[in-house]
Regions:
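ASCE P-loop NTPase helicase motor core
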Residues: 1-54
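Short loop/turn segments immediately following beta-strands, especially the blade-tip
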Residues: 18-19, 131-136
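Hydrophobic/aromatic beta-strand patches that form the interior of the parallel beta-sheet core
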Residues: 45-47, 114, 193
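ATPase catalytic-site recognition across NTP-hydrolyzing enzymes
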Residues: 50-118
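Short acidic/glycine-rich loop or secondary-structure boundary segments that cap or lie
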Residues: 56-58, 86-87, 103, 122-124, ...
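Short beta-strand scaffold segments in enzyme catalytic cores
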Residues: 124-130, 289
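Mg2+-dependent endonuclease catalytic cores in nucleic-acid-processing enzymes, primarily RNase H-like
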Residues: 139-277
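Acidic, Mg2+-coordinating catalytic module of metal-dependent nucleases/exonucleases
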Residues: 275-295
Length: 295
């Protein structure tokens, strides 16, 4: 437990069943040996182990663990406790009950825009955002001007954590156009910020060029020196504002499953705690960072 893979391992092995319970997943696959479709069962199990069971463990190492100052890390590594905060970058300002909302009709005079983090072997992430101008909702709820709502998303993965679907950029753009026609009929979607890497030229052609041919254009994101840290601080500020109801905040519609799955548990960088760990599944976070730093 603890570290970049904490949330994935916990969701995969720890949460589904008590320790020692064998989980079985059955699927039908083609067997090259028999030339038939057959049921294959995959198994997985979480088995608790303790350092006390290892007679060869150096007691100096145990003393080192007992002197860890971070109580969550100490409990994780000494007791094998998975039900601890895993060093999340926003865990202290995130509250699912506050920040995750059921979708509502976007007022006509609110701005709708989108942000984009490109990926091929790793996931890409498109986020659609509604920005409040202070106009109340039909049910009377009112949010401060410039409050941002992540209202929809498109996440390019293959079903495995942090693995992309290798979708062509032109096909991504075509799907964006299709979804915008479905999600926001008769509304204008303002082009928003994207990963600046999409403007890199390859044989005179860029990903941005391919997407523009399909009618999807972007603005450049702020990737200036220090922007990663500024982005994290701005996200924390917006989430805290939403909790305290003290100013423009940030909320996420409950249909944005990948944002909810990946962003609240993103760990801090162990070498630079003012940033998130960039080897984690941070793609929805990155498109969010581009959006909230967009001026």
């Amino acid at each position: 437990p603890f570290g970049p893979g904490h949330s994935w391992v916990k969701a995969r092995f720890i949460d589904p069943a008590p320790r020692g319970t064998v989980l079985r997943d059955t699927q039908v696959v083609f067997n090259p040996q028999t030339k038939r479709e057959e049921e294959i069962t995959l198994t997985r199990v979480a088995i608790h182990g303790s350092y006390r069971e290892n007679p060869y463990l150096d007691p100096v190492y145990v003393a080192t663990l007992e002197n860890i100052t971070n109580p969550a890390r100490r409990k994780a590594w000494l007791e094998g406790d998975w039900d601890i905060p895993a060093g999340g970058a926003i865990e202290d300002v995130w509250d699912t009950d506050v920040h995750v909302m059921r979708p509502f009709d976007i007022p006509e005079n609110w701005t709708i825009t989108r942000s984009f983090d490109w990926g091929s072997s790793h996931p890409f992430s498109v986020g659609w955002w509604a920005i409040s101008d202070g106009t109340p909702l039909p049910d009377g709820r009112r949010f401060p001007r410039k409050t941002q709502f992540r209202i929809a998303e498109m996440y390019g993965w293959n079903g495995k954590a942090n693995e992309g679907c290798r979708m062509l950029s032109s096909d991504v753009a075509a799907e964006i156009k299709r979804r915008e026609a479905e999600y926001f009929p008769h509304r204008h979607v303002v082009p928003g910020p994207a990963d600046n890497a999409i403007w890199n030229q390859d044989d005179g052609r860029s990903i941005a060029d391919s997407m523009a041919e399909k009618g999807v254009v972007w603005t450049r994101s702020d990737k200036s020196r220090g922007s990663r840290k500024l982005g994290l601080e701005e996200l924390r500020r917006l989430l805290q504002n939403a909790k305290d109801n003290t100013g423009p905040g940030l909320y996420v519609f409950d249909v944005c499953k990948h944002w909810i799955r990946t962003v609240p548990t993103l760990p801090r960088d162990s070498k630079d705690p003012d940033d998130v760990d960039s080897i984690s599944e941070d793609h929805a976070y990155d498109d969010t960072r581009y959006q909230i730093l967009n001026k």
